[in-house]
Amino acid sequence: ATNLQLTLARHPPALHGLGPLSNYLRRQSMVTVVDQLLMGLRVAWLCQSEAMWAELAFEARAVGLGDREIRQVAGGPDAGWGDWDGTVLRAADEIYRDSFLSDDSWQRMATRYDAQQLLDVIFSGAEFIMLSMMANSFGVQPDDRFPDRFPVDVEYQPLMARSASARLSEARLEPIEREDWSTEVRELLDPAGTGGAVLNLYATLARHPTFFRPRAVQSAYIRTGATLSDRDREILILRIGWLCGSEYEWSQHVRVARRIGMSADEILDVAVGATASRWSRFEADLLRATDELHHQDTVSDATWSALSNRYDTGQLIDMVITVAGYRMVSIALNSLGTQLEPGRPRFPDVARQ
């Protein structure tokens, strides 16, 4: 077990909730191992997670990458890579910075990867962001058995500010229409045979049934198995959806927030952030933690200490998992171009900071 896994073992339900998707993406993904490791190393560098860098560098050496290539990852996609490897690293940069895979990267990757592999690419990059956020926030140290550390002769250069470009007006991957469902897809989307409406997100991810199942386990854990209150969870999810520019995620969770009793003004103030006057000190700290996780890929000591006055270890772990998990979902929704169902709530007219 890695140090991150041993840390998560302090809260076993979380380990079980995250395990199936992590295992799929790391061990069964349809993306080549080298492409995964290039993305993972690049994301670990961008997130400044030395624990993840050390682990992935160890794996990279096992598949033939050497000192030069591993160091070169820190230099980014323009550090002398060939066309394909540069595309993979650029995709990692975009997913991290913009929560979105650009048209150019999508088109380039589609020359080699099919729809299921593209799903795996997007979620693999987002998974490495999630793991790095957790390792940073929990203070996980590099394992002694992984000797690599960050290259000391490469200066860390933060990427330019995240793009505010408009999201896709058409889906890159369309939801599967009911008349085209296979038996396997029907068992995933409508196992009881009720004929009810299926969200566009689910009908899109069902294009990859092998991936759909472990992802559903993680989603169910965050939504129903974690230790956070409904209100705390929805504040976190709405805020990270807003920060990532995922209108679909925002829209779906506005509906959830309404069902659990949050008012329209409270939902609006999630977009305003921690400075809105209506929040309790604790709720402002939740929003602040989300902002820190999005912008710095970790929770500051001050915010962690403040949250620790109310949250126990399991809740602190679940707080980070919730934000990181829905950052992953936002990246996927944006990159797939998943469109809102008719009549659903849109983003509020609130200036972005």
Predicted regions and their residues:
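Hydrophobic alpha-helical segments
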Residues: 1-353
